[in-house]
Amino acid sequence: MIFVLGIDAATWRVIRPNMGRLATFRRLCKIGRCRELVLKEKPISPSVWCGMFSGKTPEEHGHESFAVGGSLVKRQDMKVEFIWDILDREGKKVRVLNVPFIVPPYSFRVDFRPVGFGLPTNEKEWHEELERVTEKTRELLTESPDLLISTYTLLDRIQHFHWGEDYVLEWYRRVDDKIGQLLFDTGFLEEKQNKLIIISDHGFCSFGEAKVQTLPLKSEWGELKGDHHENALLIVANLDYEIERPQDIFFALKNLK
């Protein structure tokens, strides 16, 4: 089984200085390979997630925004095949949960309604997403699919509006705990044939440091404190394929038997 766990906006800038308080990340870095994945493309979420699971560059897939001409982009508007389409056609058992290359985030062969239409913007919704995505992912793990892809989105919004605050670490600790439940409490990583990829679509930094502004400085949710950085997170375990760019996730999954 291959499990790809996406953590939108996860960054080593928060994790590395706080390894003593993030037991799951600390444990993963002892048993797997942990490093930064430096994006050569713009750290724009819909584009990066799309390329990650289609194998296409931004120039090839042309998907840069959640909305075009005032309308939300839908899966059927996109002229690419994703890894789950290919593997499903080949007869593989594939489950995909909450991947945010569109709004609301996309699921495949899974019945799931994203929290807050996929844009959780307050503490209640962040708690709800964390609980519901964890619960559903754990349920899907018991089905033993050939490929499971699942994504948490909450850290992106939290960091946009709370970057530099202790509040951000509080949420990393909550996410760290849930990842531990998925990977260690279930025994997933005890099975050596199981392969794991944990990846973010970008890192994070202060608003002034960001090379790309992804949200207005002021919004109904508050003033932006942080924004996307090109240094994404990557953790792999039991995987030999070298990942140097987001698109390599597609090829790693396509080449694994």
Q: For the regions a protein language model found, what residue spans apply to each?
A:
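Feature captures the catalytic ectodomains and active-site-proximal regions of enzymes
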Residues: 1-257
